[in-house]
Amino acid sequence: MLPYPQIDPVAVALGPLKIHWYGLMYLIGIGGAWLLASRRLNRFDPTWSREKLSDLVFWLSMGVIVGGRLGYVLFYDLHAYLANPTLIFEVWKGGMSFHGGFIGVMLAALWFGKRNNKSFFELMDFVAPLVPIGLGAGRIGNFINAELWGKATDVPWAMVFPPFSDPAQLPRHPSQLYQFALEGVALFVILWLYSRKPRPTMAVSGMFALFYGIFRFIVEFVRVPDAQLGYIAFGWLTMGQLLCVPMIVGGLFLIWLAYNRKPTAKPAV
């Protein structure tokens, strides 16, 4: 069994002002995505300035934050937030939904593309290889918060999470780290390498949806579902898995469509 490295969720406290690691992970993810996007900016559109790229990253980040929070409220704990709506704004305590953030990003990309003469999939193919940076950083934030841990297990790398998070004090799968490895590291490597060569429009977006859906679906088998939801069907299906099914199907369809129509191949950057 490995010791859980207890880290204060508050990174910096300046009087009443508290800066949480969870929030810093979002900033790290957004900043890292911007840096890598700037490296591929000329391949995407030589006429774009760094300022326009910053605008894109800003609006997509707003889509992640607003969509992620509202997605968690709607998909995972609507009753509690209806009972106390002020809880919606306590984002430093966790409670973000990837699938909600994904919807938020798509809506932001649609809006930004129309204002800047870019198609939806041009933008999505550009940003898809950058998303795993934010996903990986977010999972580290979950780990520091000691939330979203896995089922009890006797594997050698099991961890006992703090009593405030897990009163049962059982050795558990560190599922946040599994998700960091798959959704952060593995997904980044797959998409970054795949997008280095010219790909048909929609192909990189399809690869993102497919592999994220697969990785998340797998990890959900060892992750404890949200207590207020539990398993929603068959005694094993979680909300996360249910939301991944359309991503997997949609990803396969986009890849098939990308390679079975006749667009001009562009660098998917």
UniProtKB/Swiss-Prot annotation:
Pathway(s) the chain acts in: Protein modification; lipoprotein biosynthesis (diacylglyceryl transfer)
Domain of life of the native organism: Bacteria
MF (Gene Ontology): phosphatidylglycerol-prolipoprotein diacylglyceryl transferase activity
Bilayer topology term: Multi-pass membrane protein
Record: residues binding a 1,2-diacyl-sn-glycero-3-phospho-(1'-sn-glycerol): R139
Keywords: Cell inner membrane, Cell membrane, Membrane, Transferase, Transmembrane, Transmembrane helix
GO biological process: lipoprotein biosynthetic process
Location relative to the cell: Cell inner membrane
TM region positions: 17-37, 56-76, 92-112, 120-140, 174-194, 202-222, 237-257
Listed EC numbers: 2.5.1.145
Stored PROSITE patterns: LGT
A cellular-component GO term for this protein: plasma membrane
Task of the protein: Catalyzes the transfer of the diacylglyceryl group from phosphatidylglycerol to the sulfhydryl group of the N-terminal cysteine of a prolipoprotein, the first step in the formation of mature lipoproteins.
UniProt family annotation: Belongs to the Lgt family.
Protein name per its UniProtKB record: Phosphatidylglycerol--prolipoprotein diacylglyceryl transferase
Organism: Pseudomonas putida (strain W619)
